[in-house]
Amino acid sequence: MLKIIIPTLMLMPLTWLSKNNMIWINTTAYSLLISLISLSFLNQFNEDSLYISLTFFSDPLSAPLLVLTTWLLPLMIMASQHHLSKEPITRKKLYITMLIMLQLLLIMTFTATELILFYVLFEATLIPTLIIITRWGNQTERLNAGFYFLFYTLTGSLPLLIALIHIQNITGSLNLLLIQYSAQTLPNSWSNTFLWLACMMGFMVKMPLYGLHLWLPKAHVEAPIAGSMVLAAILLKLGGYGMLRITMILNPLTSHMAYPFLMLSLWGMIMTSSICLRQTDLKSLIAYSSVSHMALVIVAILIQTPWSYMGATALMIAHGLTSSVLFCLANSNYERTHSRTMILARGLQTLLPLMAMWWLLASLTNLALPPTINLVGELFVVVSSFSWSNLTIILMGTNIIITALYSLYMLIMTQRGKYTYHINNIKPSFTRENMLMALHLLPLLLLSLNPKIILGTMY
């Protein structure tokens, strides 16, 4: 594990000691190198070596998320170059340092062995994200968004800490490798019901569950591009990862307790998809689509079959890359037209034909077209939910149709039609941006050739 953590840590002095004209090149190149090193974690079960120490370990569930985390840092740095170009040099360095610190905390969160350590790191990821949103956001509402973000996440996860300490008292250990062998079965009683709720609520808020999702659109819309990317791609996955890890302690109570949350997720996924259809703000639309995709993941985790677990992990990785590329595209529009309103930035296909291709690919990935891994994840989830209850196929089908509708609506609103007169003199698309989109979409297409590396522990 240290072969990733130490190089990531050393990216900070690299940022501050680089020459002013070399900051972007150095940090991007070295972070890309780190992400290539981390690819070896995906292959660990074909060899004899296990990546396990007393503090950090990596297994097929955390490895794909780990690789996604390291893969996104160079992409975030590439995406942030334009809107930081007018900032003074110390601020650029501080911004990159925040991103590196966030990546470091996320790597340690996904690989923590001890649940209390996991909790501490889970909370620590709030700090850099909050600074990024409230310091570099675009509008003045960013402070409001920061408050929402902090308040929801902290209030949701305080009961989790108390529950973890309680479990520590009962079992005597919170080590993830030991607890699956020593965990006692939780009988159905009032106190255990509250224990289940306390354990799940922190992750449900982070996912977010429909009804607890109000912080997400606010935070997404106000965050700068790197903030939006890391929020959609990785911070939401912390919730799913935590749920997958902690359900093995809470059995067999989950099968009794899951019903209201399953209903809420199934209802919420259709509701948030429908909300997407009437959004005017591009970033807000992508944020609500994130909520709808994560509702599918919650359903999959709560059904608790091997197929649904595989679907949940595949969908988390797929959604991480998809939502990230959509935010990048929205940002490239915003940098040219200085507006996130879709009506004001329409007809861009005539001006930026190459960007239109990226928009088409990203929209098709979002509506889960084969051969992307979004389809793999959604198929697993739909099939496992159908075998749980036949009625869910109606809700799932409706959701898939509405997803297709808003994805195509987003594409048509931004790319088609006659362009408005105020965007005659926009800049062409840069090589940097094309590279950025390619590095997002290539993994999505290539992973469909070998999806077993992202199907998690159950494969």
UniProtKB/Swiss-Prot annotation:
Catalytic activity entry: a ubiquinone + NADH + 5 H(+)(in) = a ubiquinol + NAD(+) + 4 H(+)(out)
Primary location group: mitochondrion
GO-annotated cellular components: mitochondrial inner membrane
Annotated EC: 7.1.1.2
GO biological process, one term: mitochondrial respiratory chain complex I assembly
GO molecular function terms listed in the Swiss-Prot or TrEMBL record: NADH dehydrogenase (ubiquinone) activity; ubiquinone binding
Membrane topology: Multi-pass membrane protein
InterPro entries per the UniProt record, alphabetical: NADH4_N, NADH_Q_OxRdtase_chainM/4, NADH_UbQ_OxRdtase, ND/Mrp_TM
Bilayer-spanning residue ranges: 22-42, 60-80, 92-112, 113-133, 145-165, 194-214, 224-244, 257-277, 284-303, 308-330, 351-371, 393-413, 435-455
Localization (cell): Mitochondrion inner membrane
Keyword list, A-Z: Electron transport, Membrane, Mitochondrion, Mitochondrion inner membrane, NAD, Respiratory chain, Translocase, Transmembrane, Transmembrane helix, Transport, Ubiquinone
Job description of the protein: Core subunit of the mitochondrial membrane respiratory chain NADH dehydrogenase (Complex I) which catalyzes electron transfer from NADH through the respiratory chain, using ubiquinone as an electron acceptor. Essential for the catalytic activity and assembly of complex I.
Subunit-level organization: Core subunit of respiratory chain NADH dehydrogenase (Complex I) which is composed of 45 different subunits.
Family: Belongs to the complex I subunit 4 family.
PANTHER family: NADH-UBIQUINONE OXIDOREDUCTASE CHAIN 4 (PTHR43507:SF20)
Name of the protein described by the UniProt record: NADH-ubiquinone oxidoreductase chain 4
